[in-house]
Amino acid sequence: MRGWLRHATVAFIALISLIPAASAENAKAHRSARLHRMVIQVDQNDSTVMNLALNNATNVIEYYRAKGQDVNVDVVAYGPGLNMLRADTSPVQDRIKNLKNYAFPSRIQFSACNVTKAGMEKKEGHPIDVLSEVVMVPSGVVRLMELQEKGWSYVRP
């Protein structure tokens, strides 16, 4: 019985000694699979700028897809750029719908500034609808700041 206990103890100690090595390998693999994140600013009511922003997003998604990696993209629209995400004025709404579906397994979000939306509603005198793919954020500029503070790469087409 003592022999069995001694062998079990030695096996247990040997097993425990492998844990730090496995943890180090996992940490190394995790670091090499870095999460890619990009935020794109759209603040102009210009279809050329809007299309360029969508081209940038598509190109980045395709680049990392070819490498077998995912990327998170957030297109933040505020000021006159909010027209990109309005249901009644967006010249790129079909591209937005298609890109939202195309991006998977990467992730793309379209963020609309609520400060801008409220200002437009007040000026126009009626509620404004945004595209169904849009997430409302309290402030577009604050969203840009917070994502950059978290390490997101910033692009302004």
Predicted segments with their positions:
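Secreted/extracellular ectodomain signature
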Residues: 23-157
